């Protein structure tokens, strides 16, 4: 079951990306009845999900690599082809390795801590959607950069 988390570790950058897109709903004029606070809590929830997914994937990949020595040298790969025509291939390829998952776990863990601190620090501020959307978009970019 936990190996499934390692095989789907490419989904980890999508959690903060979805959170940053959901933050747009709390932009001024779209949702004004609830105020900006739910935006921060949704970003914290999605960041925590990304952290848990990357931590479980790291544990699963580490226990899989210690099961056999040949598994260490075979990282999980994924790819997505956007355009493939006349010898031109434009796509997105990535490797899920143990160092990449360690870096992604550190990134998402620090992001959760920054989110908790920011919720307390920005208590009376109305700029939550812009701040938390930018923060989650930055985290999604860092996690995607680690995987490629």
Segments (PLM) and residue ranges:
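Transmembrane helix-loop-helix hairpins at membrane boundaries of multipass inner-membrane proteins
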Residues: 1-10, 14, 26-133
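Transmembrane helix interruption/hinge and helix-loop junction motifs
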Residues: 98-99, 146-148
């Amino acid at each position: 079951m936990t190996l499934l988390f390692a095989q789907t570790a490419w989904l980890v950058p999508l959690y903060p990306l979805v959170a940053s897109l959901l933050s747009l709903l709390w932009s001024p004029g779209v949702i004004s009845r609830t105020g900006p606070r739910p935006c921060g809590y949704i970003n914290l929830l999605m960041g925590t999900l990304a952290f848990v997914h990357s931590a479980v994937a790291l544990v699963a990949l580490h226990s899989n690599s210690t099961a056999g020595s040949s598994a260490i040298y075979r990282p999980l790969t994924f790819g997505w082809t956007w355009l493939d025509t006349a010898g031109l291939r434009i796509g997105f390829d990535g490797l899920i390795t143990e160092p990449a998952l360690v870096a992604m776990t550190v990134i998402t863990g620090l992001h959760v801590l920054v989110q908790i601190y920011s919720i307390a620090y920005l208590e009376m501020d109305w700029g939550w959607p812009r701040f938390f959307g930018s923060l989650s978009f930055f985290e999604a970019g860092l996690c995607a950069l680690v995987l490629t």
